[in-house]
């Protein structure tokens, strides 16, 4: 089964934005990004001006995909958490539900323990929203499948006849 595109309403987006905004403040992080596993940014909070969000989103998705490959090599389903420690800034990357990736950038003014604690709570809330979005998409897809297009029986030959080719 192929994955459906993630389509959400404004209300759901605002809920996601509120959760990551709260996470950014509560964890004393510089920036929080929510991206999907395809590398598309969904939402962000914090000082994002100095960061190339598009590159960050796609590289994070690639990092998660590569790490999934490593997990499978050693018999794990996945590694749900990645941590990269730098001289000034650190990256905490975690999987949210089946589709999301939460990226938290923090420095020495916060701690890994605080970030992990706050991410755990936010991840549960975000996963619930993703689940609702996927359930709605699944319901809409099954309703659409029952709809038969009036154009489904038109062939290229019929179009050529119509325009006199």
Q: Could you tell me what each predicted segment is?
A:
Residues 2-29, 38, 42-165:
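Acidic, low-complexity cytosolic segments
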């Amino acid at each position: 089964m192929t994955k459906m595109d993630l389509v959400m309403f404004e209300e759901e987006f605002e809920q996601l934005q509120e959760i990551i905004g709260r996470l950014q403040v509560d964890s004393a992080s510089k920036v929080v990004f929510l991206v999907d596993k395809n590398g598309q940014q969904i939402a962000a909070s914090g000082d994002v001006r100095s960061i190339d969000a598009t590159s960050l989103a796609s590289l994070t998705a690639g990092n998660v995909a590569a790490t999934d490959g490593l997990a499978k090599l050693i018999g794990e389903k996945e590694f749900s958490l990645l941590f990269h420690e730098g001289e000034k800034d650190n990256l905490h990357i975690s999987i949210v539900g089946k589709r999301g990736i939460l990226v938290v950038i923090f420095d020495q003014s916060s701690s890994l323990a605080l970030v992990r604690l706050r991410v755990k709570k936010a991840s549960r809330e975000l996963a619930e929203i993703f689940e609702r979005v996927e359930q709605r998409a699944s319901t809409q897809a099954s309703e659409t499948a029952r709809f038969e297009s009036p154009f489904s029986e038109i062939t290229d030959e019929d179009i050529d006849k119509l325009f006199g080719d």
